[in-house]
Amino acid sequence: MTSQRTLPVLIIFAVLVLTFAGCRENPPLTTQEAEGKHLYEVRCAHCHEDNDLALKKVPPSLHAVFKSATLPSGTPATDAEVRHVVLAGKGMMPSFNGRFDDAQMSALLAYLHTGLREAAP
């Protein structure tokens, strides 16, 4: 009789654990990520923010730029390639050479690696 009750209890427990495991809050942004967020908002978001247009997004959203093996252009999704595209420009993207120093570029990359998440309150 006990074993008949144990299985449903274990199933309910497993479902609850899995449900709450997905409810974690985002950890706070590091100082570098927060600086990158500010740079993104000031210099990138006005072109790369998501919108509700039914058109193909040009320029692309950067929310998951490092979640894929390649960038929207088909080149590898690496820090070096993103740095190159930002500083040299590519296609319709203008060059930002001279607008980011090395520390700022590293901060922007750190923020892009977060998937553009918000910090926990």
Task: Indicate residue ranges for each PLM-predicted region.
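C-terminal capping alpha-helices of c-type cytochrome domains
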Residues: V86, M92, N97-P121
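Inter-heme linker and motif-flanking segments adjacent to c-type heme-binding CXXCH motifs
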Residues: R24-L29, N51-L55, P72, T114-P121
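Cys/His/Pro-rich metal-binding microdomains
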Residues: A45, H63, P94
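The canonical Cys-X-X-Cys-His
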Residues: G36-D50, L108, L112
